[in-house]
Amino acid sequence: IVMQQAKDAKYAGYYNVGPDDCDCVSTGELADLFVKHWGEPAAWKNVAEANAPHEAGFLKLDCAKLKKRFGWAPIWHVDQAVAETVHWYQAWAEDKDLTAVTEEQIREFLSVK
């Protein structure tokens, strides 16, 4: 995206990057996936407070602009994307070399095609 934006101003702007419709999950399902991939002792509990502001139970990014302009499609399904996100945050929590972790994840991602 950045390379195209540098070459041609018609690509300027912002783009949402997210899952296909078939991979959209509720916020609770997303939390469940995070806990599953983090492992013990991770847990979460849905506790609604009486006067709390409304929280959306389902959030979705509209990636139509990105798909139309670049022919983009997600490579990882939601489970894999969450697993890789958890892996990165675990590396951060363990004070690992985040540059190395990030570069490895990029290599893995680019090798999927």
Which residues fall in each region the model found?
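Conserved C-terminal active-site "lid" loop/helix of NAD(P)H-dependent oxidoreductases
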Residues: 14, 51-73, 92-94
